[in-house]
């Protein structure tokens, strides 16, 4: 951190570092032990710290404050340099470890992790999800796509006129049986591939989603590997690409557009793990085509982990600032000339504003690790089943995939929405200094909010999850059973007739009862939506709002359930009371308070308890957590390099650090701006009379009026 180097003072300067150091010294638990909980075990936690240290010491990868002053072109150049550097890492570590490295990079340079993720997380995952074993080996390994040597892939799904409606994509892949080739074509402007990360300048190949046309028949959207650039990095004949230009954020990514003008590719460039086309033009359709979209799951799962780390980063910044920053004298101290001003976090309102986001960060951690391990095992089992052509195992994997689609969809949408809220609300809690680029909030917010849109628009994803929950409810009422994380829906008939689950403040403190309350709310909202459906002839658009609510509640149920399971099995029992406090605050504020309308409408708790929730329960929890805030944020173990905020460093020296960064990046010796000429022309312009040559002056009037 750069010091402001102010050595002469005529008064006593503020000392925010002392406040933070004092609270750190008073910590009642070891943040290192808590970090093991957050990362899902000591081994994962140690790997996290090793990788963080490597990147911090790497002169190319390490973050700094110049990052916030870079132009679009400078961001892209830096991103390219960092990608080149990271290829050396991927050649020397397992893919699992490199994925962990990408996750950490997403904290301080999300555009870098995205550029890598486009190739590894989308292009290569598309190969694995849709290609045969031979195709995966050829493109990913033999052609070195996984090492970004020779091939750098992009993911060509979205079009100018279609995004969420994948089935409506209009790029065509027409089979030419005479030449054993597919002809890839963009029939009109709406079918232009759009927002394609890496397409503008980087990608050599694209996994193109296009309509399979054989013998004049449309077989729907399939995937094809289409070369974009040759070995000289010049575009291939018939391929036209362009840069989309400046975006709200992530300018380090060269998002582009692509148009194909009758581009020919060999038949075997079609990925044929499921759908197959023979040289004679015979089409073999997959029995369960939805499996081909498994490539999207990895990205959604990664976003849950990103939500945890980003929320942890900015709740840490805001809370350190709130402890170091003092404003006004509160209570009896207001008349004491020698009393210090009050720390921001000692104001009850500030606690209500920030502490729920600290709690949320903790809760997301458990579900992030759980969903990550679940997808790894599920996809592995599916691949084995498909390779062995074992229909029994395939059907079992499909059941797991369906559950995973629901859980990952609700978690991706809910967590990315919440993380966006965390960044912005924490920024507001830091006042004017939070608006500085060097606080990190501004760029992070602009970079983050695309997460609410790509790889499944959040509202569309949420509605698909809610729709599935409603279908489950109808199935249960018809005698069917639900498997997986939503098996509580099997209690539908019982929960429809239950009395209020939460009746007292003591019930609010019982996390198992809160979990039950969420289950009851989900069942009752879903049942009510099913009745609305009947009244509207099964039109799901009439229950869009309810479907989004169901998805959010499903995510909160998953997160709280996983957190409680991990807490129960955690070996360091001395940390459990602190974890319970965090979970109670999360459930009280992020769940019960935010969804109070639904809980009240469904009779899950009475109106009187809602009043006690706000006036008594939440303030008590904030007061309980307040002394441990520094220890709880230190437990994230994010270094100053990862946090990269001038007002959120570990030492707490807010003003010296912030002033030092400002001076270093904007040297006060440069007193004239590049546009000083325009300012000087304005300030030193002649008077209006002089510019009019004094032709309208009194003297001129006297002369001309004679």
Swiss-Prot record:
Cofactor: FAD
Cellular localization per UniProt: Peroxisome
Biased segments, Basic and acidic residues type: 686-699
Keyword Manganese set for record: no
Biological processes per GO annotation: fatty acid beta-oxidation using acyl-CoA oxidase; lipid homeostasis
EC nos: 1.3.3.6
Classification via Gene3D superfamilies: Acyl-CoA dehydrogenase/oxidase, N-terminal domain, Butyryl-CoA Dehydrogenase, subunit A, domain 2, Butyryl-CoA Dehydrogenase, subunit A, domain 3
Domain of life: Eukaryota
Assigned keywords, A-Z: FAD, Fatty acid metabolism, Flavoprotein, Lipid metabolism, Oxidoreductase, Peroxisome
Catalytic activity: a 2,3-saturated acyl-CoA + O2 = a (2E)-enoyl-CoA + H2O2
Entry GO MF terms: acyl-CoA oxidase activity; FAD binding; fatty acid binding
Pathways per UniProt: Lipid metabolism; peroxisomal fatty acid beta-oxidation
Chain intervals for the UniProt region annotation (Disordered): 682-706
Family annotation (Pfam families): ACOX, ACOX_C_alpha1, Acyl-CoA_dh_M, Acyl-CoA_ox_N
GO cellular component: peroxisome
Family: Belongs to the acyl-CoA oxidase family.
Designated name of the protein: Acyl-coenzyme A oxidase
Taxonomic lineage: Eukaryota, Fungi, Dikarya, Ascomycota, Saccharomycotina
Gene: POX1
């Amino acid at each position: 951190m750069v010091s402001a180097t102010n050595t002469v003072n005529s008064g006593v300067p503020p000392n925010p570092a002392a406040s933070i150091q004092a609270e750190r010294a008073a910590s009642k638990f070891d943040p290192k032990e808590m970090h093991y909980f957050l990362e899902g075990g000591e081994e994962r936690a140690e790997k996290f710290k090793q990788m963080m240290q490597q990147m911090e010491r790497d002169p190319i990868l390490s973050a700094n404050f110049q990052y916030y002053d870079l132009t679009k072109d400078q961001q892209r150049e830096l991103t390219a340099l960092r990608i080149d550097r990271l290829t050396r890492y991927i050649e020397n570590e397992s893919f699992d470890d490199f994925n962990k490295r990408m996750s950490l990079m997403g904290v301080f340079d999300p555009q870098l992790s995205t550029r890598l993720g486009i190739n590894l997380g989308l292009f290569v995952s598309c190969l694995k999800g849709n290609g045969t074993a031979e195709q995966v080996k050829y493109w990913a390994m033999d052609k070195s796509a996984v090492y970004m040597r020779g091939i750098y892939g992009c993911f060509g799904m979205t079009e100018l006129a279609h995004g969420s409606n994948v089935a409506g994509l209009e790029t065509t892949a027409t089979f030419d049986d005479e030449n054993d080739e597919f002809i890839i074509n963009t029939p009109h402007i709406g079918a232009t591939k759009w927002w394609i990360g890496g397409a503008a300048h980087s990608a050599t190949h694209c996994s193109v989603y296009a309509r399979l046309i054989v013998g004049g028949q449309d077989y729907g959207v399939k995937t094809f590997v289409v070369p974009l650039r040759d070995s000289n990095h010049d575009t291939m004949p018939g391929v036209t690409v362009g840069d989309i230009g400046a975006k709200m954020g992530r300018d380090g990514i060269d998002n582009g557009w692509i148009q194909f003008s009758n581009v020919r590719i060999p038949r075997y460039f079609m990925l044929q793990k499921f759908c197959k086309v023979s040289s004679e033009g015979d089409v073999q359709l997959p029995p369960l085509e939805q499996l081909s979209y498994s490539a999207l799951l990895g990205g959604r799962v990664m976003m849950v982990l990103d939500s945890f780390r980003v929320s942890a980063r900015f709740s840490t910044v805001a809370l350190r600032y709130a402890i170091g920053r003092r404003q006004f004298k509160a209570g009896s101290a207001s008349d004491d000339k020698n009393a210090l001003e009050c720390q921001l976090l000692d104001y009850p309102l500030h606690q209500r504003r920030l502490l729920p986001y600290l709690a949320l960060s903790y809760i997301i951690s458990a579900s992030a690790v759980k969903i990550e391990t679940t997808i790894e095992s599920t996809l592995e089992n599916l691949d084995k089943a498909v390779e062995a052509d074992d229909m029994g195992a395939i059907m079992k994997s499909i059941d797991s995939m369906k559950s995973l689609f629901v859980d990952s969809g609700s978690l991706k949408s809910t967590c990315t929405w919440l993380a966006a809220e965390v960044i912005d609300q924490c920024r507001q809690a830091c006042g004017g200094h939070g608006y500085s680029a060097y606080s990190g909030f501004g760029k992070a917010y602009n970079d983050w909010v695309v997460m609410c849109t790509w790889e499944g628009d959040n509202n569309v994803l949420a509605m698909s999850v809610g729709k599935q929950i409603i279908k489950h409810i109808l199935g249960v009422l018809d005698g069917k059973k639900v498997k997986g994380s939503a098996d509580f829906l099997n209690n539908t008939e019982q929960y429809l007739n239950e009395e209020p689950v939460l009746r007292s403040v003591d019930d609010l403190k019982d996390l198992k009862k809160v979990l039950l309350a969420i289950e009851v709310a989900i069942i009752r909202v879903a049942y009510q939506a099913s009745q609305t459906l009947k009244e509207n002839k099964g039109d799901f658009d009439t229950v869009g709002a309810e479907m989004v609510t169901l998805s959010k509640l499903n995510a909160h149920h998953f997160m709280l359930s996983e957190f409680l399971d991990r807490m129960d099995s955690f070996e360091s029992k001395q940390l459990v009371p602190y974890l319970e406090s965090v979970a109670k605050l999360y459930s009280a504020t992020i769940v019960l308070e935010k969804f109070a309308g639904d809980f009240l409408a469904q009779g899950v708790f009475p109106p009187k308890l809602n009043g006690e929730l706000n006036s008594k329960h939440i303030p008590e929890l904030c007061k309980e957590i307040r002394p441990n805030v520094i220890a709880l944020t230190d437990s994230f173990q994010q270094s100053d390099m990862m946090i990269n905020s001038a007002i959120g460093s570990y030492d707490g020296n807010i003003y010296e650090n912030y002033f030092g960064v400002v001076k270093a990046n904007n040297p006060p010796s440069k007193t004239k701006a590049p546009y000083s000429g325009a300012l000087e022309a304005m300030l030193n312009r002649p008077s209006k009379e002089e510019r009019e040559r004094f032709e309208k002056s009194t003297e001129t009037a006297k002369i001309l009026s004679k």
